[in-house]
Structures are given as structure tokens and as C-alpha cells.
């Protein structure tokens, strides 16, 4: 399963965002996931469930459908707090780098209010643009330090074997960087690695970071009066990145209020359903929250995790079934499983994802919506419902 890392300096609301993402909605019970380490958790990306489109009542197993929206579990990691010099082991640098290594994409949480300095201490008028710059530099220098270890020896060997991609893949093993990423990063470089300069290697580290560790910027504490101008600065400075105004604190408050039976959430709004539990202070807080939701169209937290999977990691949702007429499995569960697969995945890829033997003995697949047969190379589309026909017993 792909994993998203939450990164940022101390006191920007990163842990609050982690808690907001991993706090289960009231309707989602306990699912039998593997034991999660303290800094790892299960969040839910959301996508329209095909049940409404098909006019059927679904019975999910690996996910949950709430008001026609499928909630699909994904893994997130709260990366150790970041301070300048982390790549040299400063602060919790080594822990930070180990956490970083595991993630496929990042949500960089910055304090859009400008009330915390580079170390996370209280201050006034700090520029969050600097937070993004120093984080990118830390990751670049970390990749660079791994890339250049025993570089002369590696470059000579790669030159002799005429396989720089394999040499780089071996050198960067453990960083979740695949061969395609490496090929893309070096395509404009000299074919002879022994000619690569220090500047070339630093630029290569930057390219590898951009390709293999894509990132969203969460402009957190967006409800603060000083945040708006900083959010605009972030958008202007980092045009190549998705910048999302967020309030993790508001998201967490709403989830907990819903869990307590005080409110019912609907899309990017909510209604109070138990007035007896609401005192005057809470009512003022709810009015404040409503104003924020109206201004930004939501808390931004769900948007961050959705965009991380659907935009950065290019994922789509597909539904494998065994009965193409009832859209069900053998037990009669309708639309039982929602699978996240890479855009460009084929029917055979899905078969392998369901079970290795299904992939090995794949015969053909059926597009259950259109009731047509498709081949092994059929490219899956978002919200496809697919029956796999295989010689597997």
C-alpha cells in the first residue's frame, strides 16, 4: 500500500493533522488492519461510490460507504519533527530520514499564520515560504549525500558495465525510487557518469526528489487572521505545487463533535443535531467554524489526502466483483471491495492484485457496467467494476 508522509517543523499543527486524518468517522468501526506503529495510522480517502449510479445498495468489506461516498483506508506516517540540519542528524534528523524513506508522497504542513520560527518557537511575522525552502533543501541534501557516497568508484563501475540506471538504483536502494524515476531524472545528463560534476549530482538529487517524492503544501492554521496573505505568497512562490489552505484543528473538532453525536456533517458543512449538548461557548465556536467552511469550502484536510493519492500518486478506484450482473462477490456482497490502483493499470494487473493465481491464469475480464468482455491489456478507468475470468481454481 502506498504511504503518505506528513512533514513539517515542530508546532505547525502536523500532529493535529495526523490525528484529524486518522480519527475515524463515527460510522467507521474497527477494521482488522495490521498493527500500526505509534507514528503510523489509517486515514480514509473519499470517492463517489458507484452504488448510487447503479441504484444498488452496497455491502462493503474493505472500506465503508457513507451517504454514497466510499471511504477507502490508506496509510499515513507522522514524520518526525523537522529542523534545519536534519540531513546531518541534527534534532531527530536520523528518525526523520528513516520515516521519510518509507513515504511515497508528502503533505508538507506549514504554519500559514507566521507565528512560529524555523525551530518551531513562538514568534511574529515569520515567512512560511522559508519553511518550504528549507524542507526541500533537507530532502535534496539527504538524497545527495546517499547518491555521492563512494561516487568515483560507482561511476567507474557504471561506465564499465554500461548500466548507470542499475548502479544508481543499487546506490539509492531503500529510498522507494524505481528505475523509471531514475531514467527520467538522468535523461538530459551526459552518458558518461564519470564526467558528472558536483553541481550535476546536486541537480540530479533535486530531480529525483521532485519525481519520486511528490508533495502537497498544507497551509495550516488558515483560520488565523494573518494567514490569508501568507497563503497567497505560498501559491505565488510555489506555482508547481498544490497549495491547500487547511485547519487541522477545526477538522479534528468537527470529527469529535460528530462522534459525540452533537453534529451531522454533510459535504463541506454540518448541522447541529443535539442542541442539549451545545452551550454558548460551543455555539460561538460552531459559528466561527461555519464562517471558515464558507470561506474555504471545507477544512482542507480531506482534500489534502485525496489529492495526495489521486493527483500526486495518480491512483484510481476500481471494484473487482465475481458476479457482473449483481455486482457482487460469491457471498452476495454488493461492491464489496474498493481497490486503489495506479492510473494506466490493466485488467491483468488488477487480477494479480486480487490474487497472484488469478493473474497467472488470467483468461479475460468483463466490464460489469457495460457487460462487455475486455482483454488483459484493457486499461482500467476510475470507478470501473470488473469481473476477472481465470483458469484458477
UniProtKB/Swiss-Prot annotation:
<comment type="similarity">
    <text>Belongs to the TRAFAC class OBG-HflX-like GTPase superfamily. OBG GTPase family.</text>
</comment>
<keyword id="KW-0547">Nucleotide-binding</keyword>
<dbReference type="Pfam" id="PF08438">
    <property type="entry name" value="YGR210-like_G4"/>
</dbReference>
<dbReference type="GO" id="GO:0016887">
    <property type="term" value="F:ATP hydrolysis activity"/>
</dbReference>
<dbReference type="Pfam" id="PF02824">
    <property type="entry name" value="TGS"/>
</dbReference>
<dbReference type="InterPro" id="IPR013646">
    <property type="entry name" value="YGR210-like_G4"/>
</dbReference>
<dbReference type="InterPro" id="IPR012676">
    <property type="entry name" value="TGS-like"/>
</dbReference>
<dbReference type="InterPro" id="IPR004095">
    <property type="entry name" value="TGS"/>
</dbReference>
<dbReference type="GO" id="GO:0005525">
    <property type="term" value="F:GTP binding"/>
</dbReference>
<dbReference type="InterPro" id="IPR027417">
    <property type="entry name" value="P-loop_NTPase"/>
</dbReference>
<dbReference type="InterPro" id="IPR012675">
    <property type="entry name" value="Beta-grasp_dom_sf"/>
</dbReference>
<dbReference type="InterPro" id="IPR031167">
    <property type="entry name" value="G_OBG"/>
</dbReference>
<feature type="domain" description="TGS">
    <location>
        <begin position="314"/>
        <end position="390"/>
    </location>
</feature>
<feature type="binding site">
    <location>
        <begin position="78"/>
        <end position="82"/>
    </location>
    <ligand>
        <name>GTP</name>
    </ligand>
</feature>
<dbReference type="GO" id="GO:0005737">
    <property type="term" value="C:cytoplasm"/>
</dbReference>
<dbReference type="InterPro" id="IPR006073">
    <property type="entry name" value="GTP-bd"/>
</dbReference>
<keyword id="KW-0342">GTP-binding</keyword>
<protein>
    <recommendedName>
        <fullName>Uncharacterized GTP-binding protein MJ1332</fullName>
    </recommendedName>
</protein>
<feature type="binding site">
    <location>
        <begin position="8"/>
        <end position="15"/>
    </location>
    <ligand>
        <name>GTP</name>
    </ligand>
</feature>
<dbReference type="Pfam" id="PF01926">
    <property type="entry name" value="MMR_HSR1"/>
</dbReference>
<feature type="domain" description="OBG-type G">
    <location>
        <begin position="2"/>
        <end position="266"/>
    </location>
</feature>
Amino acid at each position: 500500500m502506498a504511504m503518505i508522509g506528513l512533514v513539517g517543523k515542530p508546532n505547525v499543527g502536523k500532529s493535529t493533522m495526523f490525528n484529524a486524518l486518522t480519527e475515524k468517522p463515527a460510522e467507521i468501526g474497527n477494521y482488522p488492519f495490521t498493527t500500526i506503529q505509534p507514528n503510523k495510522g489509517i486515514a480514509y480517502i473519499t470517492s463517489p461510490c458507484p452504488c448510487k449510479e447503479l441504484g444498488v445498495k452496497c455491502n462493503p468489506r474493505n472500506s465503508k460507504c457513507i451517504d454514497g461516498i466510499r471511504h477507502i483506508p490508506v496509510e499515513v506516517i507522522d514524520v518526525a519533527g523537522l529542523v534545519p540540519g536534519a540531513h546531518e542528524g541534527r534534532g531527530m534528523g536520523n528518525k526523520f530520514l528513516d520515516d521519510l524513506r518509507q513515504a511515497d508522497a508528502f503533505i508538507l504542513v506549514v504554519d500559514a499564520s507566521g507565528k512560529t520560527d524555523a525551530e518551531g518557537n513562538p514568534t511574529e511575522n515569520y515567512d512560511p515560504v522559508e519553511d518550504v525552502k528549507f524542507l526541500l533543501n533537507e530532502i535534496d541534501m539527504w538524497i545527495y549525500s546517499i547518491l555521492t557516497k563512494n561516487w568515483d568508484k560507482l561511476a567507474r563501475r557504471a561506465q564499465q558495465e554500461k548500466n548507470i540506471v542499475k548502479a544508481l538504483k543499487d546506490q539509492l536502494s531503500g529510498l522507494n525510487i524505481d528505475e523509471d524515476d531514475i531514467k527520467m531524472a538522468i535523461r538530459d545528463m551526459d552518458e558518461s557518469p564519470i564526467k558528472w560534476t558536483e553541481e550535476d549530482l546536486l541537480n540530479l538529487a533535486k530531480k529525483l526528489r521532485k519525481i519520486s517524492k511528490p508533495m502537497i503544501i498544507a497551509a495550516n492554521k488558515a483560520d488565523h487572521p494573518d494567514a490569508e496573505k501568507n497563503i497567497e505568497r505560498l501559491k505565488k512562490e510555489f506555482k508547481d505545487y498544490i497549495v491547500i489552505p487547511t485547519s487541522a484543528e477545526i477538522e479534528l473538532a468537527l470529527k469529535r463533535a460528530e462522534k459525540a453525536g452533537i453534529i451531522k456533517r454533510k459535504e463541506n458543512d454540518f448541522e447541529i443535531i443535539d442542541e442539549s449538548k451545545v452551550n454558548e461557548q460551543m455555539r460561538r465556536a460552531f459559528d466561527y467554524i461555519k464562517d471558515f467552511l464558507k470561506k474555504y469550502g471545507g477544512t482542507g484536510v480531506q482534500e489534502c489526502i485525496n489529492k495526495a493519492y489521486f493527483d500526486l500518486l495518480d491512483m484510481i478506484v476500481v471494484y473487482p466483483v465475481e458476479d457482473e450482473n449483481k455486482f457482487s462477490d460469491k457471498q452476495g456482497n454488493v461492491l464489496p471491495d474498493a481497490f486503489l490502483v495506479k492510473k494506466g493499470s490493466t485488467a491483468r494487473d488488477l487480477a494479480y492484485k486480487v490474487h497472484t493465481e488469478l493473474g497467472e491464469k488470467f483468461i479475460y475480464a468483463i466490464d460489469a457496467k457495460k457487460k462487455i468482455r475486455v482483454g488483459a491489456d484493457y486499461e482500467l478507468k476510475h470507478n470501473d467494476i470488473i469481473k476477472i475470468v481465470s483458469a484458477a481454481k
